[in-house]
Amino acid sequence: MSAQREGSLEAPTRQPLDWRNPDFYDGAKLYAELERVFGHCHGCRRCLSLCDSFPTLFDLVDNSETLEVDGVAKKDYWKVVDQCYLCDLCYMSKCPYVPPHEWNIDFPQLMLRAKAARFKEHGARTRDKLLASTDLVGTVAGIPGISVLVNAASRSGPLRKALEKVAGIHAGARLPCYQSRPLRRRLAGPRGLDPAVAVAGVRSRGKVALFATCYANRNEPGLGEDLVAVLEHNGIPVTVPQQERCCGMPRLELGDLESVARAKEQNIPQLARLVDDGWDILALVPSCVLLFKQQLPLLFAGDEQVKKVAAAFFDPFEYLLARHKEHWLNQCPFRLGVFKVGH
């Protein structure tokens, strides 16, 4: 009998997702893998304090006749899947059995597989398709004049109740406001710093192409303007890609991998050209960064442009910290005193 070692003693690794393989969507094989992984999770429970997937799973097991995963109805597995939003916390911080452990548990990627199999067979609900259509909704809702009506409607109790009945969006859910002057338009045209003045460091090349993201572009453009101000204050030239569409993360969370592939085909070539021209890439929304740095390389493992973009992609704070460690940030001349500086 071979001895089983406790996990998390080696750096975790991930295998590419073979999502083009018909076996990826095979119902019987999917249920068998869900039962296997759920069984290990039930016996461990270190992840209880994370998202609702795990309390949901453990309640199903504890209320079953056998008190084991085999007592849980297969149809109830989807209650667990629906609670996962692919944040990766269980994989990164809790699970002791991630690869290269022999149990080979990658809970978020299994949830993505389940979502993809369901989407392939059943599609998505109207509500989910609407919320995931960020480019379309943002373009229409951002039309001057229309944005005023949309923002007023999102605060109207009667209209929100009607929307809940029609589209399933809860009347009490907070919806973002839409701006008629998006971030990409605000940043269009020549910027204040010449890219030729960029100073490269060890990890960073000192000039940034900003992937605006749907949220910062249409809903909170001030976030992008603030980030650009910080970058330019520190001598970092900024540009924006000529074109940009939704990164595909909302579609990934639905399991709509074909739509993710289409978004990749539009975004990656131009981002790769920017990388070739010496630009680092930043995005304002963490889930967008996660998609470009991690999910796309797993979905398209053989695509060299995807790898190139992933290597040059940064979270804004990650980027600023790298510049700070390389002594390329301008220090703010704060004078410390009582009530002078607040955080």
List each language-model region with its residue ranges.
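Glycine-rich, histidine-containing beta strand-loop boundary motifs that form or position
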Residues: 45, 55, 88, 94-99, ...
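Short cysteine clusters
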Residues: 41-47, 51, 84-91, 95, ...
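Generic N-terminal leader/targeting and pre-domain segments
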Residues: 1-25, 29-44
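Iron-sulfur cluster-binding electron-transfer modules in prokaryotic oxidoreductases
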Residues: 105-343
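A short, structure-level motif marking secondary-structure boundaries and short turns
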Residues: 22-23, 32-33, 66, 211-213, ...
